[in-house]
From Swiss-Prot:
Transport listed as a keyword: yes
Cofactor note: Binds 1 [2Fe-2S] cluster.
UniProt family annotation: Belongs to the 2Fe2S plant-type ferredoxin family.
NCBIfam families documented for this protein: fdx_plant (TIGR02008)
GO cellular component annotations of the record: chloroplast
GO molecular function, one term: metal ion binding
Keyword Plastid: yes
GO biological process annotation, one example: electron transport chain
Domain of life according to the entry: Eukaryota
Organism: Scenedesmus fuscus
Protein name per its UniProtKB record: Ferredoxin
Keyword entries, A-Z: 2Fe-2S, Chloroplast, Electron transport, Iron, Iron-sulfur, Metal-binding, Phosphoprotein, Plastid, Transport
InterPro entries: 2Fe-2S_ferredoxin-like_sf, 2Fe-2S_ferredoxin-type, 2Fe2S_fd_BS, Beta-grasp_dom_sf, Fd_pln
Subcellular location: Plastid, Chloroplast
């Protein structure tokens, strides 16, 4: 799938297979995104989905209300369609 990442330094579109976490694909493409635990248990890598769908069933940090607003943990999110994500959204969670 095509994953568009809107970062503070600009917009990048990368290819991300449906079995690869978005954070991992971004790193392979040379992008520097924030992360900490890489296990879906903190909010360092949080982003916000602007369009498209992801599967983040491996995460354990976000509550239903946060996910309902479109927040996503990129370290444990797989794309299930072409998706656009606003990165660096940890502060917006709180």
């Amino acid at each position: 799938y095509k994953v568009t990442l809107k970062t503070p330094s600009g917009e990048e579109t990368i290819e991300c297979p449906e079995d690869t976490y978005i954070l991992d694909a971004a790193e392979e493409a040379g992008l520097d995104l924030p992360y900490s635990c890489r296990a879906g248990a903190c909010s360092s890598c949080a982003g916000k989905v602007e369009s498209g769908e992801v599967d983040q069933s491996d995460q354990s940090f976000l509550d239903d209300a946060q996910m309902g607003k479109g927040f996503v943990l990129t370290c444990v999110a797989y794309p299930t369609s072409d998706v656009t994500i606003l990165t660096h959204q940890e502060a917006a969670l709180y």
